[in-house]
Amino acid sequence: MTRLGIAAFALIALVVGAQLVPVTRTNPAIKADVAAPAEIDALLRRACYDCHSRETAWPWYSRVAPVSWLVVHDVEEGRRELDFSAWDAYDAAQRAKKLRESADEIAEGEMPPWYYRLVHADARLTAAEREALRAWCGAEIARVSR
């Protein structure tokens, strides 16, 4: 067997073996979703909820290692940073901070991340949609800061 053949066999064995490493793809119970106008709710669900809620639509590739490890990690990190399904768990100051950070990241084009938009065309936001989300964040910050 040639070196190339051995390397190919080792790579295949590694990929097959990686499938045996379990990952936990969960959608915990929803505590209370964020209340937003219908237009904003639709944008949030389309572009944010897969990582920032407990309503993740797990794609087929979330079942194939090593990509599954990255997807699960991103969802867990997203929920830690901002979980729209646990909105009531945040006090007013936390909500204002999370909304401020969200508005900044949306304005800078950091959210949704480029690699998510690459495989989720529906998560690509137009300039008008970004502005609508930023305006809603600003209005919510004002509302919760009273």
Task: Give, region by region, the residue ranges found by the protein language model.
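Short cysteine/histidine-rich zinc-coordinating motifs and their immediately flanking basic loops
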Residues: W60-P66
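Extracytoplasmic electron-transfer domains, predominantly the class I c-type cytochrome c fold
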Residues: W69-V119
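The canonical Cys-X-X-Cys-His
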Residues: L44-T56, M111, L133
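Electrostatic cytochrome c docking/interface patches
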Residues: T24-L44
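Extracytoplasmic/secreted proteins, especially bacterial periplasmic and envelope-associated proteins
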Residues: E39, L43, P66, L70, ...
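Surface-exposed patches in mature extracellular/periplasmic domains of secreted proteins
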Residues: E55-W60, V144-R146
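C-terminal capping alpha-helices of c-type cytochrome domains
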Residues: G109-E110, R117-S145
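Hydrophobic membrane-insertion alpha-helices, especially the h-region
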Residues: G5-V21
